[in-house]
Amino acid sequence: MSDDEDDINLYITRSKNNENKKTNKNRLIDNNIQKTKTTTAVLTTRTTTTTTTTTASTQLKWDYGDEDDDDYSAPKDIDEEQSSKQFNYQNNQIVVKQDHDDYSAPKDMDEEQSSRQFNYQNDQTLVKQDDDHDDYNEPKDIDSQSLIDEDCDFEFDNSDFFFDDGTTNNNDNNNKNNKNNNNNNNNNNNNNNYNNNNNKNYKRKYYQSYNNSNNINNNNNNNNDKFEKRLSDLKKTGKEEAKKRGYQVRKTPTKEKKIPPSFKVIDGTNFLVDGFQYKSEDFTHYFLTHFHSDHYVGITKTWSFGNIYCTEETGKLVSHKLGVDQRYIVKCEWNKLIEIQGVKVAFLDSNHCPGSALILFIIPLRNKDGEIIGEESILHTGDFRYNQSMNNYPLLKGRTISKLYLDNTYCDPQYVFPPQPEIIKQVASIVRKENDGETLFLFGTYVIGKERILLEIAKQEGKPVHVSNEKYAILCCLSTCLDINKFTTNELITPFRAVTMSMLSYHNMLSLLDSSNNKYKRVIGFRPTGWTQAKKSITYLNRGPTTFYSVAYSEHSSFNELRDCIDHFRPTQIIPTVDCDSPIKVKNILAHFSDLYEKKKQLTIASFFSAQPVTNFFQSFFKSKSEPIIDEDNKKLIPITTTTTTNINTLTATDTTTTKIKTSNTLIKDEFTDDLIWDCSDDLISDRKLLTQSDNSSALCKIEKEENFNDLSENNNNSNNNNNNNNNNNNNNNNNNNNNNNNNKLIIENDIKEEIIDFDDPVFISQQKWIEKQIYNNNNNSNNNNFTTPTKTNGNLSNNAKLNLTPTQTQTQTPTQNNKKQKTTNVSPTSYNSNNSSQQSGLKRSKSDPNVKKNQLQTSQPPSQSLITSFFQKCASPTSLFSATPPTPSITTTSNQSTKNKNSTTTTSTSTSNNKPFKN
């Protein structure tokens, strides 16, 4: 009996539970029906509101239906025929489809894609709306992803769902989970599916509910007439209503114009080079240097902004890869000028990749009246690798480049790598050694580029290089500049493969090795790029069966090549095109080339002592300074008298010479040449002569040096100067210009006025200091030398007896107390032309001669000193400067008592008095 009672009790319990379930079910159904009645009316009036939502996803808001329908006005952009709508319930999602008879889909959309679609998913409405509305535009202040109710300060949580009684629904068909009287009724009939999963109890008055689609469709059909009336009225006031709601009415949105950087625009034109992302109505002509993605970025298949000028190879790639209409592509021939808006343009090979080009722009220069007065040449390098052969391009040879748009990718001293042919040769050598039939070779490439290595390997090994189908199609576009037979798409016939740079990693190389089915036992990869190793041609890394070579093969100019390019073309202005977004960066880039300009601009005195012609200097600096003076009364030429003071560390003598000039008004072209070469090694001037005289001018040139070049005692200066003056007066009656020994200026006497030229040029002063330093160092070296003891020599001496001295000899006159007459010792490079030069070799130095002078004078001539001494002498005296025989320093001993001292002996000795470099 107990078992029967238990069964009965269980049956009764189950019956009660079933009754409770039915009761709960009926109660919930009644509640939902009541809610449906209230929300249906609201939904029918709010349906048009959803069509005005312009964001990608929205959330609907509903109220209790107490709004007055008469106060509602539909959006202005809904036509009468657009008022019918369809709402379909599918798995808790409402799909709203609206038919637009007057709607025209965009060109790239199908008819089905042109209609608006509203997708309700997880309490969110996804709204897709076309962009071609004539009268409507989305407000700026509305988020394009979600539109939250203005009165709601929270967002829906899709993970939680609540009922009216506060209990949770687990959304499960299992009846064991219905402990809280929750009913999960999952029926396949969408028309009778009252879903309770999305009912949520909120403290606010807004909630969402998904209703039966049949009821909604019926309500829509019943209210069509009402909507048609309202829409016909709103056509008149649609724009005003939109303005009240804050919408901006415009047909097409305007995008902000991008301003291109200066290095993308050719100065003086509206030409844009490699700047397609900055396309606008301001530019109608666009230039593409080569087909690399960082240069053609901005070009799409819908390009219609202007002509694209490029080479034939690049034009084929633009059409093939990007799908640009052929009518916008202008393929230009190599090395041929074309005219675009009055500007001549030419494409030259840039040695970068197939089809890459330098672009030369020749822009006419006009005056205010519009007349052409000249032309300006601008060169844009794009990406290039400089080669000496570019100097011989017919369109560039001898042309002055005003602006150079420079590819400065490797403008850094650390990027110095060998030339391309050398790197290709090294790679080919490695392949030849390692190609044993069991090695797979990988070569990193770009879309285009690095083809020279591939062609060399295929030529050397006699096998083509495998490329992908896409790569092969690209190479076919370049068939005019490379051999397409060197490439194949069959990887089974060759161990050489061209891969992308990303494939040159350890794991990728291993995977390729494994996929070869043991055909290859090891793999070698080459990464040809100049970024990897500066100043090293090839480096490698070995790891198991993989070997990785980093090759300094670059298709950009190295640092040295950039300097060679600038040094050759010498543009007026350099405009960098890489990493130049700030003035500091531009300044640092240009600093690498500043020395190339400075060395050309500086005119230093050092050039006078080099083996370079100095004709221009003398003709410009001493122009009309050494021309003959014409006596207007006698119509005769007055001889030019030059007074030269010679400095050999110590001021030992003065030499006065008078140069007779031919009585001819024509230039002396038969005696002078156009250049002057100074031989620094021998301290001599060549026998070439410089034309320094011209007609129609007159001047008297004197170069006088102050006496304090050297440290001499006042007594010696006075005695020597007095004797010099006496001797010069006796021997040269017409010369009165040797008395001023305290002037350190170049005096030009021209009739009445005196033109004084000081040596105050900064370059002259800086070089003079350098020369003084050299002389000072030489003097110190000479003071430390051990000099030989003078030997006594007997011989017959005349009044103008001379002593020949070499630059290494030092001579000093030993004074005597019993000398009755003062003697002067004159040193001059021109004194070797005197009549007594035959007696120079017979002179010997005597230490015990009683007629030796008191003063000790140093007469040694270091090499650098004789350069300076001769320089000032030559500037002053055309005879001494351009004499046929090189001058030799000498000492001239002069006596006032010629008859008494014929047999006397003159003794010279060495003095090591303090020597100071001369100052300006």
UniProtKB/Swiss-Prot annotation:
InterPro entries: DRMBL, RibonucZ/Hydroxyglut_hydro
A GO molecular-function annotation: 5'-3' DNA exonuclease activity
Coarse class of the protein's main subcellular location: nucleus
Composition bias, Polar residues: 84-95, 115-127
Swiss-Prot/TrEMBL GO biological process terms: double-strand break repair via nonhomologous end joining; interstrand cross-link repair
Disordered as annotated region, ranges: 62-147, 163-201, 236-256, 711-742, 777-865, 880-920
GO cellular component, one term: nucleus
Localization terms from the record: Nucleus
Keywords, in A-Z order: Coiled coil, DNA damage, DNA repair, Nucleus
Ranges of Basic and acidic residues composition bias in the record: 97-108, 128-143
Start-end of Low complexity biased regions: 163-200, 715-742, 777-841, 856-865, 890-920
Function: May be required for DNA interstrand cross-link repair.
PANTHER family: DNA CROSS-LINK REPAIR 1A PROTEIN, DNA CROSS-LINK REPAIR PROTEIN PSO2/SNM1-RELATED
Family the entry assigns: Belongs to the DNA repair metallo-beta-lactamase (DRMBL) family.
Name this protein carries in UniProt: DNA cross-link repair 1 protein
Species for this entry: Dictyostelium discoideum (Social amoeba)
Lineage, opening ranks: Eukaryota, Amoebozoa, Evosea, Eumycetozoa, Dictyostelia
Gene from which the chain derives: dclre1
